[in-house]
Swiss-Prot record:
One GO location term (cellular component): nucleus
Compartment annotation: Nucleus
Protein's name according to its UniProt entry: Transcriptional regulator PINT87aa
Pfam families linked: LINC-PINT
Function noted in UniProt: Enhances the binding of the PAF1 complex to target gene promoters and plays a role in negative regulation of transcription. May function as an anchor to keep the PAF1 complex on target gene promoters, sequentially pausing RNA polymerase II-induced mRNA elongation. Inhibits FOXM1-mediated transcription of PHB2.
Gene from which this protein is expressed: LINC-PINT
Keywords: Nucleus, Transcription, Transcription regulation
Length: 87
């Protein structure tokens, strides 16, 4: 089952295709993927065809099995979407 952000929690697409949260940064406090840890942001990525959450400091496994590393809040490289995997 996919992890989905609350309706209306993200707004205004950034140039990278991600969805921004509140003005001035990404939203905090959501849970990520299969890991019960706090998210750095609750944003959506259209590159893989479904919303994903991104963790602040640890990799997580997305719905399609890719590992995605959240490096910096608001500056995410969707490595899984490009065939890269972090461990």
């Amino acid at each position: 089952m996919l992890w989905l952000p609350d309706r209306g929690s993200c707004s205004a697409r950034s140039p990278s295709g991600m969805l921004r949260g509140a003005p001035g940064g990404w939203r905090y406090g959501r849970r990520c993927g299969r890991r019960r840890q706090s998210c750095c942001c609750c944003c959506c990525c259209s590159h893989v065809g479904a919303p994903l959450s991104f963790h602040r400091e640890a990799s997580l496994v997305s719905h399609d099995g890719h590992d995605i590393m959240k490096q910096h809040c608001g500056e995410e490289s969707i490595r899984g979407a490009h065939g890269y995997k972090n461990k």
